[in-house]
Curated annotation (Swiss-Prot):
Entry keywords, A to Z: Antiport, Endoplasmic reticulum, Ion transport, Membrane, Mitochondrion, Nucleus, Transcription, Transcription regulation, Transmembrane, Transmembrane helix, Transport, Zinc, Zinc transport
Purpose of the protein: Mitochondrial proton-coupled zinc ion antiporter mediating the export of zinc from the mitochondria and involved in zinc homeostasis, zinc mobilization as well as mitochondrial morphology and health. In nucleus, may function as a secondary coactivator for nuclear receptors.
Gene Ontology CC: cytoplasmic vesicle; endoplasmic reticulum; mitochondrial membrane; nucleus
Family: Belongs to the cation diffusion facilitator (CDF) transporter (TC 2.A.4) family. SLC30A subfamily.
Annotated compartments: Mitochondrion membrane; Nucleus; Endoplasmic reticulum
Source organism of this protein record: Xenopus laevis
Protein name: Proton-coupled zinc antiporter SLC30A9, mitochondrial
Spans traversing the lipid bilayer: 230-250, 305-325, 333-353, 389-409, 415-435
Pfam families reported for this sequence: Cation_efflux
Gene giving rise to this polypeptide: slc30a9
Main subcellular location of this protein, as a coarse class: mitochondrion
InterPro entries the UniProt entry points to: Cation_efflux, Cation_efflux_TMD_sf, DNA-bd_dom_put_sf, SLC30A9, XPA_sf
Catalytic reaction(s) noted: Zn(2+)(in) + 2 H(+)(out) = Zn(2+)(out) + 2 H(+)(in)
Length: 559
């Protein structure tokens, strides 16, 4: 008590007490602060400093009905009662009952830390590669069957990462030894690959041996139909046209004929590049290119557009300007007219082949001819179409300018024809560069197609809503679809319960007596429900691909 009397008022006010201030009825007393375990009186400045502390115990009461706290505070209460002369006896205001504390049972929160990997699963291949183990080392480990992430396979075996690490430490002794072994194996693998690249024949044999099980498309079949057929026909015809136009230019010296020869040469080289792009786009995906090589068609078409501008337009402008600055007399143009007429027929035939192919493809996609061309849905055929259209117009332009030169004897008209053909080629190259660049950047599919895919997902009972939909055209009639899905947890849980024995689940519930039993029950069924949710995602992806064959890659994220 002496310590309490000696303390200052500021220190007494800083006591951490949950209390409610009430007025004290005793004479000379200003305030009284009361808590469940502590009663503290604040005297006025006119009276000697006094403090009365009453402690309550939550233990059982004694047989006489009193408590330790009540007996301990009886004498101070009597002394306070004597302070008021009008009240000879003052009753105690303290509650006689002990404190009742109700404790809520909760599970202890587990601290996993910033890095927790004890519940991670890894496949057998990763265990062998990352921890340098042998198949015999995995036989003694716990094997767990999990749902496969692939649609066409069943459940597969995984191992706990902690078990694999413990086995690796048992085999190798320390993490440093594992790191050294992994580094040595990596060096051996690099040396092995270098040896393979030294012999192309062995490389092909080893690639086939190492598991490229998907059948490759036959190159012959690829160029016998569709865009491949159009490109091969264009290469043959433009190659012949270049040869004959070159002979006509050597014989006549016409600037327009020189521009047409360059035009045919540029078309031949560009279409050979398109054929290379078509063959490369059919390559099967590999670990370095998981989405395949379909963009090779757009890349080849883009380079083709640049080549048309550099070789065709640039040289045509150059030769036309030289003809304007230094006009040269032109020989007889009879052979040139014959070659132009033959080229017009051949280029027109190639143009008709390209038009028929685009018309058939656009009808299959439900698009108009103009939309199909402007959206560059088939870049290879589009290049052939634009080149042949420019070739036909260029032939008409060259023949007109050569005719004016023959009638007037002025070679300037022929030079103007060369400039006109160069301008036409520049416009074609600009169109090809723009459309293929847009396709390579990543272009969305048609809005009505996106709406149809979204409605297909929203019509499923397990889906509440679809958000952040992204559907991009990957080329070659392939679509990549991505969306965030808000699943209905009740439907997913009901789907899980439909596959369970309800009587067995009820029996498990009746056996739950403690918090630990409840935790084990929830962990077991919670993990199974998560697996059911993953199965629902796989089911939706599979249905989306089956109903829309153009959708090749689906990424559904759980919201």
């Amino acid at each position: 008590m002496a310590g309490i009397y000696a303390r200052s008022w500021p220190s007494l006010f800083r006591l951490y007490m949950r209390c409610a201030g009430t007025r004290c009825s005793g004479h000379g007393w200003q305030n009284a602060l009361e808590s469940k375990g502590l009663l503290y009186f604040l005297p006025s400045s006119y009276l000697p400093i006094q403090a009365h502390i009453r402690l309550y115990s939550s233990s059982d009461q004694k047989e006489d009905g009193g408590s330790k706290g009540t007996s301990a505070a009886s004498s101070p209460e009597k002394s306070m009662a004597g302070l008021d002369p009008s009240k000879p006896e003052q009753k105690s205001t303290f509650p006689p009952d002990p404190i009742q504390v109700k404790v809520k049972a909760v599970l202890k929160k587990r601290e996993y830390g910033t890095k927790y990997m004890k519940n991670n699963f890894i496949t057998g291949v990763r265990a062998l590669n990352e921890f340098c183990l042998k198949p015999s080392d995995l036989e003694s480990l716990r094997k767990i069957r999990r749902r496969s992430p692939h649609d066409d396979t069943e459940a597969f075996t995984v191992y706990l990462r902690s078990d694999v690490e413990a086995k690796a430490y048992e085999v190798w002794g320390s993490p440093e030894a594992i790191f050294r072994e992994r580094k040595m194996r990596k060096e051996e693998e690099i040396a092995y690959r270098e040896n393979l690249f030294r012999n192309q024949k062995l490389l092909k044999e080893y690639k086939d041996f190492l598991g490229n099980t998907k059948p490759r498309l036959s190159t012959t079949n690829m160029f016998m139909k569709g865009p491949g057929k159009v490109v091969i026909v264009a290469i043959c015809i433009n190659g012949l046209n270049f040869f004959f136009k070159l002979l006509a230019w050597v014989y006549t010296g016409s600037a327009s004929m020189f521009s047409e020869a360059l035009h045919s040469l540029a078309d031949t080289l560009n279409q050979a590049l398109l054929a290379l792009g078509i063959s490369q786009s059919a390559r099967t995906p590999d670990p370095g290119h998981p989405y395949g090589f379909t963009n090779m068609r757009y890349i080849a078409s883009l380079i083709s557009g640049v080549g048309i501008f550099m070789m065709g337009a640039g040289l045509s402008w150059y030769h036309g300007i030289i003809g304007l600055l230094h006009p040269q007399p032109i020989e007889s143009l009879l052979w040139a007219y014959c070659i132009l007429a033959g080229s017009l027929v051949s280029e027109g035939a190639t143009l008709l082949v390209a038009i028929n192919e685009i018309r058939k493809s656009s009808r299959a996609k439900g698009l108009s001819f103009y939309q199909y061309v402007m959206q560059s849905r088939d870049p290879s055929t589009n290049v052939v179409l634009m080149e042949d259209a420019a070739a036909v117009l260029g032939l008409v332009m060259a023949a007109s300018c050569m005719g004016l030169t023959s009638l007037t004897g002025n070679p300037l008209y022929d030079s103007l024809g060369s400039l006109g053909v160069g301008t036409l080629l520049g416009a074609v190259s600009a169109f090809l560069i723009y459309t293929n660049t847009e396709a390579l950047i990543g272009r969305s599919i048609q809005p009505d197609q996106v709406q149809r895919l979204t409605e297909l997902l929203e019509s499923d009972p397990a889906v509440r809503a679809i958000h952040d939909v992204k559907a991009t055209d990957m080329g070659m009639s392939k679509v990549r679809f991505k969306a965030e899905v808000d699943f209905d947890g009740r439907v997913v849980t009901r789907s899980y319960l439909e596959k369970q024995d309800i009587d067995l689940v009820l029996n498990e519930i009746r056996q739950v007596k403690t918090a630990e039993d409840l935790e084990a029950f929830m962990l077991k069924h919670g993990e199974n429900i998560i697996d059911t949710l993953g199965a629902e995602v796989d089911r939706l992806e599979k249905e989306l691909k089956q109903r829309n064959p153009e959708v090749r890659h689906v990424d559904l994220e759980i919201l």
